[in-house]
Swiss-Prot record:
InterPro entries from the UniProt entry: DNA/RNA_pol_sf (IPR043502), Reverse_transcriptase_msDNA (IPR000123), RT_dom (IPR000477)
Family: Belongs to the bacterial reverse transcriptase family.
Stated role: Reverse transcriptase (RT) component of antiviral defense system retron Se72, composed of a non-coding RNA (ncRNA), this reverse transcriptase (RT) and the following cold shock-like protein. Expression of retron Se72 confers protection against bacteriophage lambda. At multiplicity of infection (MOI) of 0.02 cultures slow growth when infected with lambda but do not collapse, at MOI 2 cultures enter growth stasis. Responsible for synthesis of msDNA (a branched molecule with RNA linked by a 2',5'-phosphodiester bond to ssDNA).
The Reverse transcriptase domain, residue ranges: 1-245
Keywords in alphabetical order: Antiviral defense, Magnesium, Metal-binding, Nucleotidyltransferase, RNA-binding, RNA-directed DNA polymerase, Transferase
Residue ranges crossing the lipid bilayer per the database entry: none
EC number: 2.7.7.49
Protein name per the record: Retron Se72 reverse transcriptase
One GO-annotated biological process of the protein: defense response to virus
Catalysis performed (reactions): DNA(n) + a 2'-deoxyribonucleoside 5'-triphosphate = DNA(n+1) + diphosphate
Enzyme class, first EC level, given as a word: transferase
Molecular function via GO: metal ion binding; RNA binding; RNA-directed DNA polymerase activity
Binding site for Mg(2+): D109, D188, D189
Length: 379
């Protein structure tokens, strides 16, 4: 299968859409009109350069509807095997695995992808891929976009990113396949690879084909991030979505593995004399994530490093635990169901904190966790 296929039943009316989403028609109309007020905005730092990215998180009512849209619509689509990211069993590792042991690897990045996806193209997904009626398609488009764009942080945004090129990407895939090339896309990262060395003309042709597809959607390729690597070049990193693909399976580079060992060494030294500061908690969590990545990629060193980290897990001091107890009592006295999104976030954070308390006081942690969990809705 080279083209996305919707396996659900087309929705023909707004009343049918309301029924599918499990809400009354009047409430659906109200939510559509209030979408612009239904997001929380914040910034996160991404990448090595700590670039700030705007994130828009839907509030509780809209989030519930978007999750329902995912379940009833986007999760009923068969996605082509060349798509990776935000799909079950398909992530940056499976994406890199497509391009192992290749002679030539070309990586391209779509500029400012999510905010550049137009409302018109989102509507086309519902209307022309799912075959929904025009008014249903427009209503759904309003529910999953913000200010005429696809918001980063929206529950449906990554599905939309995967489906944007539904009517043209399969043509590009087939064209490249006929040329003996492998193609994959991890959301905004496009990779093409070859079992043979490509000539300059062939590489130029491949890149032009990708440009042609994305330009149809008023998008562009970030030229500064375009890379072309060759296995015969000893200085080449041969990297796809951050992983080394020179051999049969994706791996971390030696430099990355060495850096992770160094981080764990620093963590072990610091953990020998204090494990309760915020700085130590942040360092340990960072190390833990890196070691988990090593484990997923089959690096045997991960077992040893995980054992070291398990002996120096972060803890809280008595002062912090006293503050948590007071805060938990406040939540238990003041919070009453149904909880707001903010209250749910606070309790989730508190449960995380009491997991850490459990490392030094299991009975206390168990007591407060049981009480706090009782406040949460079924999820």
């Amino acid at each position: 299968m080279n083209k996305p296929r919707f396996n659900g039943t087309p929705v023909a009316s707004l009343d049918s859409l309301s029924a599918m989403l499990g809400i009354e028609r009047k409430r659906l109309d109200w939510i559509v009109k209030s979408v612009s007020m239904s997001y929380k905005q914040f910034k996160v730092e991404t990448g090595k350069n700590k670039k700030e990215r705007q994130i828009f998180e839907p509030k509780r009512s809209l989030k519930g509807i978007q999750k329902k849209i995912n379940k009833e619509i986007f999760e009923k689509i068969d996605y082509p095997h060349y798509l990776h990211g935000a799909l079950s069993g398909r992530d940056y590792i499976s994406n890199a695995a497509v391009h192992t042991r290749k002679r030539t690897v070309i990586c391209l990045d779509i500029t400012n992808f999510y905010p550049s996806i137009s409302k018109k193209d989102v509507c086309s997904i519902f209307k022309n891929l799912m075959r929904f009626s025009p008014d249903v398609s427009l209503c759904l488009t309003e529910l999953v976009t913000l200010n005429n764009k696809v918001p980063q942080g929206g529950c449906c945004s990554s599905y939309i990113a995967n489906l944007l090129f539904f009517n043209s990407e399969y043509n590009l895939y087939n064209r490249l396949k006929s040329m003996g090339l492998s193609y994959s896309r991890l959301l905004d990262d496009i990779t093409i690879s070859s079992d043979k060395d490509l000539s300059s003309e062939e590489k130029t042709k491949v890149i032009k084909l990708v440009h042609g597809m994305v330009n149809q959607y008023r998008l562009s390729i970030n030229e500064s991030k375009t890379t072309i690597e060759h296995s015969k070049d000893s200085s080449s990193k041969l990297s796809v979505t951050g992983l080394w693909v020179k051999h049969g399976v994706p791996k971390l580079t030696k430099e990355n593995r060495r850096y992770i060992r160094y981080l764990v060494y620093i963590c072990k030294k610091q953990g020998a004399y204090e494990r309760h500061t915020k700085e130590y908690h942040d360092l340990w969590n960072r190390c833990s994530g890196k070691v988990a990545q090593m484990s997923r990629l089959g690096h045997v060193q991960a077992v040893e490093l995980r054992a070291i980290l398990s002996e120096i897990m972060p803890v809280y001091d008595d002062y912090k635990i006293s503050k948590l107890k007071l805060m938990a009592k406040h939540y238990l006295n003041k919070f009453t169901p149904p909880l707001t999104d903010d209250q749910i976030r606070k309790i989730d954070r508190m449960l995380y904190d009491f997991d850490i308390v459990g490392r030094t006081n299991k009975n206390l942690a168990k007591l407060y966790r049981r009480k706090l969990v009782a406040l949460l809705p079924d999820r």
